[in-house]
Amino acid sequence: MLDIKRLGIDDAAKLIEGARRHANDIGVPMCIAVVDESGNLIAFERMDGGKASSISVAQNKAYTAGAARKATHEYNAACVPGNLVFGIHTELSVVGGGLPVWAGDACVGGIGLSSGTPDQDMACAQAGIDYWAAHSQ
């Protein structure tokens, strides 16, 4: 029997809150997605002004980070033409803004943001994780 750690809805709310606060601080309304360790959506928020075209992008970033347990920007260099994993895109995202969420040595989910630049998306994702870590337990 497996003992699986995963994010719950309260955790997702904290991740979104932290990401939203940073997005407000930098003046960029975001789409924010949180998934469990298998990449299944737990919660999503489109801030007022978040781009409609960023809804699925944020969800794909979160999926990649949670299910693959790897930050989306780390896939970028590996997925260029000529490299062995070029073409794996489907739901996987290679654009910065998706980060795995770790509790100790367990990946418990992922957070993905979209609507800003990749650097802005990554900063907001990290702010969400930092807020969650500071307000959990």
Segments predicted by a language model, with ranges:
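Flexible, solvent-exposed loop/hinge segments and secondary-structure transition points
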Residues: 1-137
